[in-house]
Amino acid sequence: MPILAKRVLFIDAEAMIIDKPAGLPVTSVRDGSLSLENYLASLCFGFKRWPSIVHRLDRDTSGCLLLARNPKMHRRLSEAFSQGQVKKCYWAILEGVPEKNEGIIDLPLLKISSPKSGWRIVADDKGKRAVTHWEILAKNKGRSLVAFRPETGRTHQLRVHAATGLGLPIVGDPFYGSHKDENISRMMLHAHSLEIARLEKKPITAEAPLPKAFTDLGF
């Protein structure tokens, strides 16, 4: 059982941000694994009502995850996400180094599915608008640590934009990666920071420290 109460990065009467560990699903999954939903009772901190999940991170993605502490705030925060009012920054280790130091990926994304392979996201002009700003933070042994700041919030956006837009998949990505490495324990995608402005109050904001899996690869 992950001790999530010790992974709180921000908390006040309205919201909290936790550092979600990689491998923990946000909501229930078909394989029966425990998810964040199973641990919400441990995050009440004196409130009778459990906090509610405002947005999702992929199971293998770690880092900043926002929870609301009352229904009214949940509606406001959900609206902020849907209207693109949330500042998000993700850090990822890529299989290679981009030719430029920074740039913008403007690549529409479409969800496709088949009985044999299931569903996945692909770059397609018929898809929904998806825009990501990126910049290189560090390089090491043929790989790069890249900061991604998405303008939009499409499913698997950063994973597909890295693999297709930059031609460099995220290390450890089981769906969009080019090869498997037995020495890689997880997908190297981390929700580094999150910020939401509030009227007449300080912003809801936090930064999640770089996981050990990243530092083990020299970053």
Swiss-Prot record:
Transmembrane segments: none annotated. Signal peptide: none annotated. It comes from the Bacteria. InterPro entries: PsdUridine_synth_cat_dom_sf, PsdUridine_synth_RluA-like_CS, PsdUridine_synth_RsuA/RluA, RluA_PseudoU_synthase. GO terms for biological process: enzyme-directed rRNA pseudouridine synthesis. It catalyses: a uridine in RNA = a pseudouridine in RNA. Keywords: Isomerase. It is an enzyme of class 5 (isomerase). The keyword Isomerase applies. Gene3D superfamilies: Pseudouridine synthase (3.30.2350.10). One of its GO terms (molecular function) is RNA binding. The active site is at residue 58. Disulfide bonds: none annotated. Its EC number is 5.4.99.-. Belongs to the pseudouridine synthase RluA family. This is Uncharacterized RNA pseudouridine synthase ZMO0505.
